[in-house]
Structure formats: structure tokens, C-alpha cells
Swiss-Prot record:
This is PKHD-type hydroxylase sync_1544. HAMAP family: Hydroxyl_YbiX. Binds 1 Fe(2+) ion per subunit. GO terms for molecular function: 2-oxoglutarate-dependent dioxygenase activity; iron ion binding; L-ascorbic acid binding. 2-oxoglutarate binds at residue 164. It comes from Synechococcus sp. (strain CC9311).
Length: 220
């Protein structure tokens, strides 16, 4: 499993944010924040990065991510950074691209998309992520987040009706290598499941010891 999908915001919070974005946001051409190779293929709008509303949403989403143990276990985050709020209207999308490896705010090991709109509010607009042999489309429900490797080619298909509004950003992990992160996540998840089912034991202490020392060794 190289991506994580789960709910981190409730519907009421998302609806409140959508209402504020509709009434207060200053929307700019989204291509202004695209890399040189992707600029021509980005057809969306983004809220002014310096606006108080963007900073408020950034803080809310970042807090929800830091407070979610599965997000922390999967990402092993050193830094969550460069939160952008974008909306894609009819005929808008974002052609195939890979995210920049380094930004002024940090390194991109993992990318995330948090959907403020529900998948019933628009048509088209699937996020497609390429694997070695195929592409798989993903459409998020309201309040769901998808976290995936920044090393992947991906795209946002054209929206055919409605409006797709999301918060996107990047994660710099303590563990840069994807396979190492996945192994650590599986080890910790298994250990915590055993702890919940059987309670503490000397044997389980050894597993947590191995996890901690592996994290220390693999982390940068």
C-alpha cells in the first residue's frame, strides 16, 4: 500500500469552509504556482496564498493531520508544508505532471489532497495517479484526504460540471525512501493491533524496540 485514504474533517466543517470560500476568497490563476514544465496544463484557481483565510484553513487542516495517529504513522512527518486551496470549474483540470522535489518550504516526499467538496457535487475531476503499469482514478468524499508519493506522475481530469474544491500540500518525512516508510508503517500498525488485542508483553516491547531503532537508523 503506497497511499493512504481516510476521513479527517467532518461534513459540517467542510460546508462552513466552502461557504467562507464562496463569500470571502480572492481567487487567482492557479498556473501561477505551477512549475515551468506544468504551467500550461494547469487550469484552476487558487486562493491568495497570503490571505488570512488560507492561513486559517492551513492551520485547521494541519492540526487535523498532526492529531491523526494513522497519518503520523504512515507519513512519519518532519514537516507539513505549502498548503494551497484550489477550485476547478467546468473544463478545468491539471494535466499530467510530477510535483517538484524541493520547494522553498521544504522537500516533497508525499503529496496530499483533502476534498472540501463531496464527490456528488461535481462530475469528472478524478485524481489519477500512475503506477508502473496502469493509472487508477480516485474521487474523494467530503472531508477525505489522500496521501500518496510525490514521485508519482498524476493528473486531475477535466471537470465536466460543478466545482471541485480541495486543499493540497506536501509532506517532508523523516524517512525519505517510500519502501522504508511502508515497512515501518506495517510494523507499527501490527504492533499496535497486537497491543490492543492482547495488552503489553515483554515480547511486544522487543517489537517496539526494533521499530524505534529502525526508525532511528532509516530516518534522516
Amino acid at each position: 500500500m503506497n497511499h493512504l485514504r481516510l476521513q479527517i474533517l467532518d461534513q459540517a466543517t467542510c460546508e462552513r469552509l466552502l461557504e467562507r470560500l464562496a463569500n470571502e476568497a480572492e481567487w487567482l490563476d492557479g498556473s501561477l504556482t505551477a512549475g515551468a514544465h506544468a504551467k500550461g496544463g494547469k487550469r484552476n484557481f487558487q486562493i491568495n496564498y497570503d490571505s488570512a483565510l488560507r492561513k486559517e484553513i492551513h492551520e485547521l487542516v494541519e492540526r487535523a493531520m498532526w492529531n491523526h495517529p494513522v497519518v503520523k504513522g504512515f507519513c512519519l512527518p518532519r514537516k507539513l508544508h505549502r498548503f494551497l486551496i484550489s477550485k476547478t470549474e467546468k473544463e478545468g483540470g491539471y494535466d499530467t505532471h510530477v510535483d517538484n522535489a524541493y520547494m522553498s518550504s521544504g522537500r516533497s516526499d508525499l503529496s496530499f489532497t483533502l476534498s472540501l467538496t463531496d464527490d456528488t457535487m461535481y462530475e469528472g475531476g478524478d485524481l489519477e495517479i500512475d503506477s508502473i503499469s496502469e493509472s487508477y482514478p480516485i474521487k474523494l468524499k467530503q472531508g477525505e484526504i489522500l496521501i500518496y508519493p510525490s514521485t508519482s506522475l498524476h493528473r486531475v481530469c477535466n471537470v465536466t460540471s460543478g466545482i471541485r474544491t480541495v486543499c493540497v500540500g506536501w509532506i517532508e518525512s523523516y524517512v525519505q525512501a517510500e519502501n522504508d516508510r511502508i515497512c515501518l508503517f506495517q510494523l507499527e500498525s501490527g504492533a499496535r493491533a497486537v497491543l490492543a488485542k492482547h495488552g503489553r508483553s515483554d515480547e511486544l516491547d522487543l517489537i517496539f524496540l526494533a521499530y524505534t531503532n529502525l526508525l532511528r537508523r532509516l530516518g534522516g
